[in-house]
Amino acid sequence: MLAKRIIPCLDVRDGQVVKGVQFRNHEIIGDIVPLAKRYAEEGADELVFYDITASSDGRVVDKSWVSRVAEVIDIPFCVAGGIKSLEDAAKILSFGADKISINSPALADPTLITRLADRFGVQCIVVGIDTWYDAETGKYHVNQYTGDESRTRVTQWETLDWVEEVQKRGAGEIVLNMMNQDGVRNGYDLDQLKKVREVCHVPLIASGGAGTMEHFLEAFRDADVDGALAASVFHKQIINISELKAYLASQGVEIRIC
């Protein structure tokens, strides 16, 4: 059995790490490189960086900090933000990123997933999915351009259909960003995760809602996700990564101990 992964998420805007609630009202958390270094030292299994306004601004992720992060950490990291071409991806990987993640650009051009997978291998192609639960219809819908709330739009894709589509096109991993839970620390949406797990045959990462160590345990035990991503509980030092891993190990979760 592969070890489960604990993944801090760093949302980047204007060269700094920020955090919002339900993808809105972002506050500045701190500088990118020191935070990355801290999380690596605390025992994170990998890091994910989202340049949250790159796609909505029509630009690619700011590469200047990618190489600086690569210099100070010795764990894998993934970078996302406006990657719309093989050339964009090649540059980011050449600066030291281990994986690239695409989200809004994949919705605009699904063939991008296949082209990236063919060029670089499925192992480094992650597809992020921003999913919103509509209580009126009882359905999960995929949103696009979520880094800028004024430009966010609901797509025609229902979440489960898009999960299946991106796998057919070559996604090597899926990060499910559950927008309703984002930043509120009430726990992951286990019902949604279980439904996605049934149709997801590549590594699945849960994102949005972690507030306690028990929430991580529930995601691993009840929804069988491969990794759990979180931001505010780590940024605000509500949960220490090494203590979280010790707790999960004590509960029988296969985890890499620091």
Curated annotation (Swiss-Prot):
E.C. number, please?
A: 4.3.2.10
Task: Give UniProt keywords alphabetically.
Answer: Amino-acid biosynthesis, Cytoplasm, Histidine biosynthesis, Lyase
Q: What pathway is this protein said to act in by its record? A: Amino-acid biosynthesis; L-histidine biosynthesis; L-histidine from 5-phospho-alpha-D-ribose 1-diphosphate: step 5/9
Amino-acid biosynthesis keyword on record: yes
The main enzyme category here is: lyase
Which reactions appear under catalytic activity for this entry?
5-[(5-phospho-1-deoxy-D-ribulos-1-ylimino)methylamino]-1-(5-phospho-beta-D-ribosyl)imidazole-4-carboxamide + L-glutamine = D-erythro-1-(imidazol-4-yl)glycerol 3-phosphate + 5-amino-1-(5-phospho-beta-D-ribosyl)imidazole-4-carboxamide + L-glutamate + H(+)
Q: Where in the cell is it found?
A: Cytoplasm
What molecular functions are annotated in GO for this chain?
Answer: imidazoleglycerol-phosphate synthase activity; lyase activity
Q: Which one GO biological process term can you cite for this protein?
A: L-histidine biosynthetic process
Name the Pfam families for this protein. Answer: His_biosynth
Q: Which domain of life is it from?
A: Bacteria
Residues annotated as catalytic: 11, 130
The UniProt entry's GO CC annotations, sorted and at most eight, read: cytoplasm
Q: Tell me the subunit arrangement.
A: Heterodimer of HisH and HisF.
Functional summary from the UniProt entry = IGPS catalyzes the conversion of PRFAR and glutamine to IGP, AICAR and glutamate. The HisF subunit catalyzes the cyclization activity that produces IGP and AICAR from PRFAR using the ammonia provided by the HisH subunit.
Q: Which PANTHER family match?
A: IMIDAZOLE GLYCEROL PHOSPHATE SYNTHASE HISHF, IMIDAZOLE GLYCEROL PHOSPHATE SYNTHASE SUBUNIT HISF/H IGP SYNTHASE SUBUNIT HISF/H
| Family stated for the protein in its record | Belongs to the HisA/HisF family.
What is this protein's name? Imidazole glycerol phosphate synthase subunit HisF
User: What organism, scientifically named, is this protein from?
Assistant: Escherichia coli O17:K52:H18 (strain UMN026 / ExPEC)
Q: Which gene encodes it?
A: hisF
